[in-house]
Amino acid sequence: MLDFLAENNLCGQAILRIVSCGNAIIAELLRLSEFIPAVFRLKDRADQQKYGDIIFDFSYFKGPELWESKLDAKPELQDLDEEFRENNIEIVTRFYLAFQSVHKYIVDLNRYLDDLNEGVYIQQTLETVLLNEDGKQLLCEALYLYGVMLLVIDQKIEGEVRERMLVSYYRYSAARSSADSNMDDICKLLRSTGYSSQPGARRPPNYPESYFQRVPINESFISMVIGRLRSDDIYNQVSAYPLPEHRSTALANQAAMLYVILYFEPSILHTHQAKMREIVDKYFPDNWVISIYMGITVNLVDAWEPYKAAKTALNNTLDLSNVREQASRYATVSERVHAQVQQFLKEGYLREEMVLDNIPKLLNCLRDCNVAIRWLMLHTADSACDPNNKRLRQIKDQILTDSRYNPRILFQLLLDTAQFEFILKEMFKQMLSEKQTKWEHYKKEGSERMTELADVFSGVKPLTRVEKNENLQAWFREISKQILSLNYDDSTAAGRKTVQLIQALEEVQEFHQLESNLQVCQFLADTRKFLHQMIRTINIKEEVLITMQIVGDLSFAWQLIDSFTSIMQESIRVNPSMVTKLRATFLKLASALDLPLLRINQANSPDLLSVSQYYSGELVSYVRKVLQIIPESMFTSLLKIIKLQTHDIIEVPTRLDKDKLRDYAQLGPRYEVAKLTHAISIFTEGILMMKTTLVGIIKVDPKQLLEDGIRKELVKRVAFALHRGLIFNPRAKPSELMPKLKELGATMDGFHRSFEYIQDYVNIYGLKIWQEEVSRIINYNVEQECNNFLRTKIQDWQSMYQSTHIPIPKFTPVDESVTFIGRLCREILRITDPKMTCHIDQLNTWYDMKTHQEVTSSRLFSEIQTTLGTFGLNGLDRLLCFMIVKELQNFLSMFQKIILRDRTVQDTLKTLMNAVSPLKSIVANSNKIYFSAIAKTQKIWTAYLEAIMKVGQMQILRQQIANELNYSCRFDSKHLAAALENLNKALLADIEAHYQDPSLPYPKEDNTLLYEITAYLEAAGIHNPLNKIYITTKRLPYFPIVNFLFLIAQLPKLQYNKNLGMVCRKPTDPVDWPPLVLGLLTLLKQFHSRYTEQFLALIGQFICSTVEQCTSQKIPEIPADVVGALLFLEDYARYTKLPRRVAEAHVPNFIFDEFRTVL
């Protein structure tokens, strides 16, 4: 019969593909369960209030039109819904595809069963497939994996969350319009079961059997599979466990399959007492906690509670005397085998000869160890015992008492067993690889010895007192030929013949009285030894490795091992060299990957890589978690070193008097520093002792592991310091900003210095790591803060700054800001608020408007540079850009609302436009016209002023940041600054040349050069924030005249001061001049330049018309408003770096010259 798994056997390949797919689906479900967006859980009140109206469960399907009409009625809900869609459609689609795969899996399995019944596969029926060993395994696995999928989904992705995700996918995707979509079937299969994985939650009635029956499956198939699992050893595991007391361990995988599949036929669990008794007697006579798939544990006492037959059958196993007997037995076994293993692990004990002579004994010891570890780990696990279940608690307490359970001793047994297993495996692999070479070597040596003896008896080779003997000569030559004729490939015949040759050599020694000659005896003894070695070597079989692999399976502990993490870490803390022993345990755990990958590999599925990566990644993450104790301990020592160096040890001056030497010696503190440094070195040594290890398919390099661990610990501590150090009290007078920055600066300097100190002792690039990680923390926090202003947010798994191995921690927000960078920015904005402070441009300083006390100055930004570095200032700058964009967008919507939708304001503006046209003319009776328009539009200026001043305030801050960045760049990196400036000038020259002559080259759209150079220029402060275009705009009617009117409406609130320029007239009606000018300038910059032209022309017309009206007075005097307007034009030209002639185009130059002399 054709091999069932052969590539040309369609029947076998079809079911193999289904099973392979099943394993891949479970891996995907487990992977996705870690990425459920928190918002779908609707746990906290804020999420419920915000998203409650747009996230629906299956009640939505009762009347979708009703729900959608509610959404359509509220534009803000529509907007939120659209934003939610943009942010979550990618992850929701991924979940939907996983759910769809589960449904497709069972549809494919049902179709395969139908094909078998209909005879699609020639000469194959359900019965014949179940008779085949591989076919039987695959059919059982196919149904079992479907059950596991359903259980995993319910455990890892709550029913309500599934429903919300499916409804969201239905609403946001094209699935609803697709005719061939099986959305309905998927929803029916995965609707909420009412099950909750929370401890203490009640189990829903008829769960999980009603869930398992949502898609009908061929009943005779289920029945036959259960029959096979009840009667057969489908994986032939019993041969690896010959002892009867190990029978339940041998059949553990089959027992897990049977446990899951019985839910497809719950009548057996309920009423078939005989069958259940048979199942319990065969599979669960001495165990009741089982692992069903990759460490998912189930306690049968709890799981079978609702089923009468199952519960009754299990009572014998759970009889207190049986529980006591099992616990005591495993306690005794574990003590006995632990002593044996420790003996085996003694240096020099496991030699090749010893191993080859004692294979059965060593394998028995391994079996006992692994069986004891399995039973004790499963039956003492907290995850398998619901603390609210009294019976479970009693059984567990009984086990803990009778087995004298001590987690440390059990862990030590696991550690030693893993080490023992690892050494044995490595020895066997080595011996197998050298098997033929060694065998041939022994054969050659034995044959040569016989030839030499033949030569001795020929009389050719003189040997003391050996007489010539032609018979012996011929006999030894024959033996030599016989040895040479042994064939390695025919090991059975060779083994038999070797034994005969050994006997012949023993007999020849006795019959021919050869004992009298010691040299001849030695030759015979050597040859017999070589022949013995040949027998030993030929008996090295791969079956031993396979048995060790089966026996050493640790997949049941895939999750349970986590309960030993604290013990592992404590052991490492006490003795860092423990890491080398742990390596064997991690490798033993890696063998669990064989379970899900076997079928995927057999099917040559492309899923092999992603599934391997998932499980290997999970294991590597666990290894990192355990070994993280080393960087943690190093940092604890490091903090003590920092404290000693900063507070206790006095820095030695360059010149020192001899008599003061004792004062500076400080032997005590210096000895303490040396001791702590030595401890750090020991920890480093400990982790580096672990060789480069292949965990699954991921190579773990201990040096990289150490560096990543140090980075992780650094990130954790620095992120916490930044979070805690930048929390402000908005009511504090004066502001806490500068003291907190200084304090945080000292903390950051301490970290920086300690990192410099440690780098040589742990062989890392301290400064490089420091800069990379601090920049990552700041950039990530800026990104999170900017998410507030983005419609499509950057999720953690999309962020280029977030990492799974070295995660940046997230902290609960303490105010409206999400992160420390937001709090810092808002605190700066609060203390430099233009309504409260006055910015003096020449001094770069802010003063309180009422008390005239200094509030802050440009020193603030050098302090931020010292504390947070260039990354901090640059991040602050980026955040201000987002805030300006938001403010400008708000301004545009406000403009639409208060001006373009207000008939009265529009009529006033039309009248004014008519009165001032053409712009080059002088407006007659100007005062009356202007101030009448201002009076009619008075109500709109408050909101307008606030928006303009906010933008202006942020632009001033951006200028200050650019100055500080540019100064520090020129000071610290003059070559970088020069290179950037030259490259910038060269690029601008090339672009200008292209516009003069379009045949010259120009960077294309797909060329990232301009974007990349912009990032560098902004980081080096080589840019002008006032020239930046923040938003795209459309044409706005009345825009220039509204801005002009706004400006002249503000001028009466200001007065000119010779020393300070324009200042606020009354603190009760606050207006700050620099933010006002810069805010208007920035606003106009966002629109076409003709708007600016019109705006300047209107100011020029206002100045000329007002001056014209003044000259008719007896004593002509320049009005204050004209002075303000002239100063605005001057400042406008200065800030935009435009020549004065731009202003003179609208105002005669003699007025400009005159007004300065009059002031």
UniProtKB/Swiss-Prot annotation:
The modification Phosphoserine is found at S917. Pfam families: Strumpellin (PF10266). The keyword Kinase does not apply. The keyword Protease does not apply. GO terms for cellular component: cytosol; early endosome; endoplasmic reticulum; WASH complex. GO terms for biological process: actin filament polymerization; endosome fission; endosome organization; protein transport; regulation of actin nucleation. It is found in: Cytoplasm, Cytosol; Endoplasmic reticulum; Early endosome. Keywords: Cytoplasm, Endoplasmic reticulum, Endosome, Phosphoprotein, Protein transport, Transport. It comes from the Eukaryota. Belongs to the strumpellin family. Component of the WASH core complex also described as WASH regulatory complex (SHRC) composed of WASH (WASHC1, WASH2P or WASH3P), WASHC2 (WASHC2A or WASHC2C), WASHC3, WASHC4 and WASHC5. The WASH core complex associates via WASHC2 with the F-actin-capping protein dimer (formed by CAPZA1, CAPZA2 or CAPZA3 and CAPZB) in a transient or substoichiometric manner which was initially described as WASH complex. Interacts with VCP, PI4K2A. Acts as a component of the WASH core complex that functions as a nucleation-promoting factor (NPF) at the surface of endosomes, where it recruits and activates the Arp2/3 complex to induce actin polymerization, playing a key role in the fission of tubules that serve as transport intermediates during endosome sorting. May be involved in axonal outgrowth. Involved in cellular localization of ADRB2. Involved in cellular trafficking of BLOC-1 complex cargos such as ATP7A and VAMP7. This is WASH complex subunit 5. It comes from Pongo abelii (Sumatran orangutan).
